Amino acid sequence: MEDKTPIISFRNADIVNGEATVIYGLDMDVFPGDFVYIVGKVGTGKTSIIRTIISENPLYKGSGTVCGYDLKVIKEKEIPYLRRKMGVVFQDFQLLMDRTVEDNLLFVLQATGWKNEEQMHKRITTVLKAVGMELKAHKMPHQLSGGEQQRIAIARSLLNEPQVIIADEPTGNLDTETADGIMKLLTGINKDKGTAIVMVTHNRQIFEKYPGRVMICKDETCYEQKADEVIDLDITI
């Protein structure tokens, strides 16, 4: 039977950035297998939603649950456990530049409680194969292209078999062809594994070419709209 319990759910939630409220009354559900885009102009609260989802920004008003955790009452010590249930991919990759690809991934596994060396190396091999980077395990990040570094970042996000991948402008620093490859990878993970994906983007071509649900951030609100009806946004490639 299909699971209809949302992985992410907000009801009448006010999203803050520091002391300022940037979005009022957010209603949003993300279910297993969903691909949800968050789009809008710069400064409309897109990244603040992401930061709230990963419990980097607090939730004071309204309700919000992510991977079974209530964001209004989550304890500081519980936040690492919440984040283990999700994968996070950033625009700037955030790889550790002083260690190899394999050691980057090993660091994450050790930090999230893995102990068995054989199991860790097996998991690293599995995720690198999933993103087509199995031959790059012993490379340093600076030896990789931007697209390859982003593939490694996606592999890192898959290590703990997340319920959802949170991607903040994952194609923002990439050329069109490389960005297309990253989108094929993400949509493949979404379809093949049923992993939900929430992705911030400013690139209209992406959500037109790779269909998903579209949430628009505008005028201190965020609401769902059909992709082919998104005509009033000043967002560019």
Locate each region found by the language model.
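Helix-to-loop junction immediately C-terminal to a conserved catalytic motif
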Residues: I54
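Catalytic Walker B motif of ABC-type/P-loop ATPase nucleotide-binding domains
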Residues: I165-D168
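Conserved ABC ATPase signature
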Residues: M140-Q150
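ABC ATPase NBD coupling module
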Residues: L71-G87
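Conserved ABC transporter NBD signature motif
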Residues: G62-D70
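A short, proline-enriched helix->beta-strand linker immediately N-terminal to the Walker B motif
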Residues: L159-Q163
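Short coil-to-helix segment of the ABC ATPase nucleotide-binding domain corresponding to the Q-loop/switch region
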Residues: D98-F107
